[in-house]
Amino acid sequence: MEKKNRVFGVIGIKAEMANWNADFNGDPKNTPDGTIFGSDKSLKYAIKQQWLENGEKVLMVKTKKIEKGNLLVNNLEERYTKLFGKIDTKNNIEVLENLFKAIDTLTFGAAFAVKKTNHSITGAVQINQGFNKYEDTNIITQDILSPFANSNAEGNAQATIGKMVHVDEAHYCYGFSVNPTVYAEYKALFGENFEGYTEEAYEKFKEAALTAVTGLNSAAKGGCINEYAIFINLKEGSRKMLPKFDTFVTVEKEDKVIVNINKAKNLLEAYKNEIENIEIYYDDELTEVDYSALTEEIKELIKEKI
């Protein structure tokens, strides 16, 4: 079934003694002024991994093959062929139809350029950069010792010493938007053969947005969890575009982590007639969401999912 309403909100990721998104030097990504952030790709990676584990068709993901005794990475054409069969360069529309059968392409869009086939799809779901909202974050560097000798050391007698960089605690806040109307052109093109962005696809995105990071299992991301999420559901037919909601979020820590959205009071008041409801997800053992300054009319729209 086609999704007919827009959604705006935030996804909160907590990193504790972990490195949620490293740069090429292995350090947590940061802006020139030192603000730590995570790219949209890091969150999309987690979501795609969960979809893969659930048996969904995922196109834009790194996969590997063994060729002539070597472990290699598949190119885009090979990944497409694995999912949909050989590309028919004489049937450009068939390729486009297949792209929308992959959950990640349907959700996030894709740039597909293989042989004579070129498609650029703007996804219904857009995720922004996720900035750390916690002011007391420290970056920690640890020396780590490999159990193996350093092949470059004289006499090969020295063990390899490396480093592991992580944050003691950070709270990343990703703004996102869901706009099903971006596929109106393709719906007109394909007619009844294409529903556009569906409720089923949205629910799969929503489930992954709430759980995918917690499910990651690696040395760097083992301390990263889904901390909270807020979904502002507009009414069906509303064409309003809300500003990035992450700019209205602050994070502090007392006995619990306090996620404060009171700065959004004027914004939510201005759009209240366009809003169907506001869903807030969090673990109340660890987190508290403060919206005490919002008007009673806005509070009535809030549904807490603890």
Feature-to-residue mapping (PLM):
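RNA-binding basic/glycine-rich loop and surface signature characteristic of RAMP-family CRISPR effectors
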Residues: 1-306
